[in-house]
Amino acid sequence: ISVSVSFIFLFVLFGAILDTAGGGKYFLNLAFALVGRMRGGPAKAAILASGLTGMISGSSVANTVTTGTFTIPIMKKTGLPAIKAGAVEVAASVNGQIMPPIMGAAAFVMAELLGIPYFTVVTHAFLPAVISYIALFYISHLESLKLNIKGLPEKEVPNLKKTFFGGIHFLIPIFILIYLLLFQRWTAAS
C-alpha cells in the first residue's frame, strides 16, 4: 500500500500543477468552444469541462470548484434553474472520479490490493466513465428542450481553433502520462 500512497501523491501533484498552470481554465474554454453554441450549451460545456478536468484532478471537490464557479452562473443566466445548474455541475464533477487516467485514490488502491496493473483498472473504467458522461449530456439536452434553453450567442463562445492551439501545451503532459500508463505499462512499482 505504501507504493500506492506515494503514487497517489504524484498523480494528485500532477493534477494540481496542471490546474494551477491554467489547465482547468483551458479545459473550460475548450468545452465552451466545442459545445457552447448548442441548445443547453452551458450545461453541456459544464459536463465536458468537468470530464476533462476530472481526467487530471481525480477529485470531485476540486473539479466542482474549478469548473462550477464559472459554469453555474452561466447556466443560470441562460435559464436553467439554480438547483438544476448545481446538480449538473455536481453530477459531472463526481463522475470525474471514474474518468481515467487519474481516477482518484480508489483506482490505485484497487490495483495494489488486487495485484493487477493500474493499466487494467484504467482500461476497464474508461467505457463506464464515457457512458456516464454521455448519459449526463443526454439528460441535459432533454432538460434544455423541456425548458427551451438555447445555446450561448456566437460572440460569447470562444473560437475553437484559437482556444485549442492556445493551450495545446496542457495536453502534452496528459498524453505523456497516458503513453506511460498504457504503452509502457508504467506502474507504482516501476
PLM region spans:
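Core transmembrane alpha-helical segments of multi-pass membrane transporters/permeases
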Residues: 1-25, 189
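Helix-loop-helix module between adjacent transmembrane segments
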Residues: 14-20, 49-63, 92-98, 128, ...
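Hydrophobic transmembrane alpha-helices that form the pore/transport pathway of multi-pass ion
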Residues: 30-96, 106
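Helix-coil boundary and interhelical linker segments in multi-pass alpha-helical membrane proteins
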Residues: 111-127
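Long, contiguous bundles of hydrophobic transmembrane helices that form the permeation core
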Residues: 123-190
